[in-house]
Amino acid sequence: MRFIATHCYDESLGVIVTEASGLAEPGDILALYNKLHCLSGRYHCRKALVDLRKVSLSYDSASVLYTLDRLEPLLCNLQIARVVEDLDTRQQLIQEYADKQKLLMRNFFDRQTALDWLKTSLDGTRLQAGLATMPG
């Protein structure tokens, strides 16, 4: 299945919402977060919900880390709640990377918990690593 990502700004929540599906290559993920970064500037919004439950990564863990290194400059000023499937160990690797780099990026298994984290967190401040971690 071809990779597709849609983005919209939810003004009532003050959150950029991204939904993606399909088989993702590293370039697809880079484009997704680059677009998110651009939209954050356009809407003056630093909070994002990224729903990746319908995405399959087509690359290995080493490529995941390489991709994250390239993405870090785009992610460092955003607060990102990622909704993911709990069966993919690469998603946990991404969470561990975010914790290590002190990025405001957390994985969640359901959309409402992710939105709650975005609403209750202070905009523009860095939370302590591990404050909102994936259950399990």
Set out the residue ranges of the language-model regions.
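Amphipathic, Lys/Arg-enriched alpha-helical "gate/interface" segment within cytosolic domains
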Residues: M1-G136
